[in-house]
Structures are given as structure tokens and as C-alpha cells.
Amino acid sequence: MNEGQEMEEQFALLLETLKNQQMNEFRELFLALHIYEQGQFYQSLDEKDRQHLYNYLSPKELADMFDVIEEDNENMKDYLAEMRPSYAADMLAEMYTDNAVDLLNMLDKSQKAKYLSLLSSEEAGEIKELLHYEDETAGAIMTTEFVSIVANQTVRSAMYVLKNQADMAETIYYVYVVDQENHLVGVISLRDLIVNDDDTLIADILNERVISVHVGDDQEDVAQTIRDYDFLAVPVTDYDDHLLGIVTVDDIIDVIDDEAASDYSGLAGVDVEEVSENPLKAASKRLPWLITLLFLGMSTASLISNYESLVSEASILAVFISLITGTAGNAGTQSLAVAVRRLAMKDEKDSNFGRLILSEVLTGLVTGAVTGLTIMIVVGVWQHNLPLGFVIGMAMLCAITVANLAGSLIPMLMDKLGFDPAVASGPFITTLSDLTSVLIYFNIASMFMRYFV
């Protein structure tokens, strides 16, 4: 029996105990599951069965499971709405603060206020503090549940603090050292606390070179910092270096997934959230790009009409228009994907503007030369007209090179201007390459027409 089949059998047994209202048996089986598996089972239930589950689990037990359910799950609002308000509020209080904030941010203001009013002033205050931070910043994804100590403590004292606060902390692998005014002054790992003598002062073993992020930093920059330094967590500070919270690696994984999805959908000029929207709302988001590109496409049609006399003299030229524009568009899209990826990674060795442009132009020349030579031979043999093959091949070489240049240049210019390079340049490349390819093709054809007509 494979793992999937075993899980299906477990879920079937769980569902049976739930429907038969066997609370003790259900709790024993359910709480023995990994919290990820608990979340999968929970999301497979209908509302009636979930109501039974709420009666069998404490808010704390449900909170542990909600902490691992994908925060972009479109059903999260519905899950919260079907609970008793007091039960939902108790669950929010038991969740890690950053996860509770993510969940509340899915609600409208009145719903958010309702749940906050049911929390204690201390719990509501912690959540409100994070709600104030701008979306997609370090402040918005950080948690305030961490362990901090002061430099004049001993290892014994620090371990006592750690043991008492470990249950509420999201991670204990890093312990942050602050002064009396809560300025971040150092960091110490759990390993250092374990291997040093109990009477050793924290000041003697702490690492004063702390890598931190600012509360207003973009979440992509925070993800880059954690990736570069292989951290499990990174501290978040304000302008005066006061320690405000930490961002953990599990939150960064979510950020990376979200940004990848955003970049992928952006290449097509659509919104990553469209999957959960109705057709009219999705259409309203796509139409601005489509209308803009429609007018740009009309420029291509107008350009072709200007060469009507050329096409009438050599009608064979019309056969290869879509071949050249399509191949150039594909090349431009490839170049765009590479450029967007390099911009997203912010790799220093690839960040040189001129080097990136030169690399893509050379790549375009090589791929264009090979593609152009191939099509020249094919057309020459097929049409028994080598000069025509030369024209098609030369146009292919130039069109691919220009498309590669545009595919790398446009996203970098968009990035310099402060626009999202994926969303702003994705749909633009194919249409632009059509325009430039037609211009290149007909100009080369007009120069050599007397040789192949």
C-alpha cells in the first residue's frame, strides 16, 4: 500500500468517526496526524462535517492546523464565517500573529473589527500593530512571537527564558540580544547556548554582526536576504534599530511561491488572483492590456498595407510573414523570461546593465544565424529559389536579434522606472516583435527583390 492509499484510508476512517459523532475516537485519530495532513482532511469536509469538527477541537488545536493551511486559499473567509464568532476569535488569538493577520486581511473592515472586538486588548493590540504595515513589506509578514534576551544575562538565565517562552515563539533556533531600550545588539544560536557553560555571560559569546531587515523593506528583498545568508529567520527593526519582530523561512517560502505565481501570470498580462474571480471581473482586468495591444497590432497591419505593392509583385513574400513574426516573438519571449528571472534574483554578477544587453544580443545573433541558415536552405530547396531563401534567412537573423534585444531591454527599463517588469513587459514583447519583424522583413525583401522575382 502506497502513502496516498494509506492516507485515503485514514481520512475515510476519520470521516466515519466524525459522522458517527464518536468524539474520543475522532480526536485520537485526528491529533495523531501531522498538522499538514489535518489541514488536508479539514479542507476535504463539507460544512456540516466541519461543524462537528469545531465541536470536537479546541480553538488552540484548530489554530495549529490553520497556521499551515495555504493563506491564499479562497475558502479561508468562508471557514471563518461558519464558526461561532467567539470560537473564531479564540482561534485567531491562538494562531501565530502573522498568520492571524494574513487571515484577517482577507476580510472587509466590519468583519475584521468584529473579531478584533472579541479579543483581549493585548491580543488585539499585537494584531492591529501588524495590520498597519504596508502590504508585501517585512512588517506585513513578520511575527512578533520570538525570544529575546539581554547581554548581561548568563547562559543559565537565557536558557530559563528560552524554556519559558519557547511554546509561544515561532522559532527558537536564533535568540536575539537587545539592550534595555530594545535596540538589537546581537544574536546567539541555540547551539551556542547548549555548548557553553551555564555561568558564561551572553555578552561574551553573542555575535554582534547581526544581519537584519527594515520593517518597510519589500518582501522580495527580505526573501533574498534569507536566501543569501541561509537563515532560518531574520530580525526586523525600525529606523532606530528597535527589534520589532522576525521573518521566518516558512513565511519566505510563501513569498517566493506568491512572487513566482505573480511573475508567471504577469508574463501573460493577467492577474494571479483571477482564478477566484467571476468572468466579468477577470475580463475587466485583462481588457486594458488587450485594447492597448490591439492598437499596437493595428500599427503592424497598417505597416503591411504600406508594402502592398511589394507583396503584389512578389506574392510569395506573404507566405513567410507569420513564420518570421512568430519565430521572432518566441525568441523575444525567451529573452524576456531570462531577463525577468535575473532581475528577480538580483544576482550581483548579472546586474550589470550593459553585460546583460550584450549577452542577449550575442545570443540573438547565434540563434538567429542558425535559424536563418536553416530556413534559407529549406526555402531555397522548397521554392527552388536560393535568393528568396537568403532574404527569408537574413530577415530571420535580424528579427530574432532585435527581438532578443527588446526582450532584455524592455523589462530592465521597466524595472528602472519602478514598474513590475513581468507585468509591464510581458504582453508587449510579442506585439512589438511583430511590428519590428515585418519592418525588417519587407525592407530586406525590397532591397533584394530583383534577385528572386
From Swiss-Prot:
Catalytic activity: Mg(2+)(in) = Mg(2+)(out)
Matching Pfam families: CBS, MgtE, MgtE_N
Chain residues that bind Mg(2+) 2: D98, D251
Molecular-function GO terms, alphabetical: magnesium ion transmembrane transporter activity; metal ion binding
Binding site for Mg(2+) 6: R227, D230
Membrane-spanning parts: 287-307, 309-329, 361-381, 390-410, 428-448
NCBIfam families for the chain: mgtE
Keywords assigned: CBS domain, Cell membrane, Magnesium, Membrane, Metal-binding, Repeat, Transmembrane, Transmembrane helix, Transport
Residues in compartment: Cytoplasmic: 1-286, 330-360, 411-427
Protein name listed in UniProt: Magnesium transporter MgtE
InterPro entries hit by this protein: CBS_dom, CBS_dom_sf, Mg_transptr_MgtE_intracell_dom, MgtE_N_sf, MgtE_transporter, SLC41_membr_dom, SLC41_membr_dom_sf
Family note: Belongs to the SLC41A transporter family.
Residues where Mg(2+) 5 binds: Y176, A233
Binding, Mg(2+) 4: E136, E259
Underlying gene: mgtE
Compartment(s) of residence: Cell membrane
Quaternary structure and partners: Homodimer.
Lineage: Bacteria, Bacillati, Bacillota, Bacilli, Lactobacillales
CBS domain boundaries: 142-205, 206-262
Membrane topology: Multi-pass membrane protein
Residues at which Mg(2+) 1 binds: E71
Its biological purpose: Acts as a magnesium transporter.
GO cellular component: plasma membrane
Gene3D superfamilies for this protein: CBS-domain, MgtE N-terminal domain-like, SLC41 divalent cation transporters, integral membrane domain
Residues the entry annotates as binding Mg(2+) 7: D434
Ranges facing Extracellular side: 308, 382-389, 449-453
Residues the record lists as binding Mg(2+) 3: D102, A140
Originating organism: Enterococcus faecalis (strain ATCC 700802 / V583)
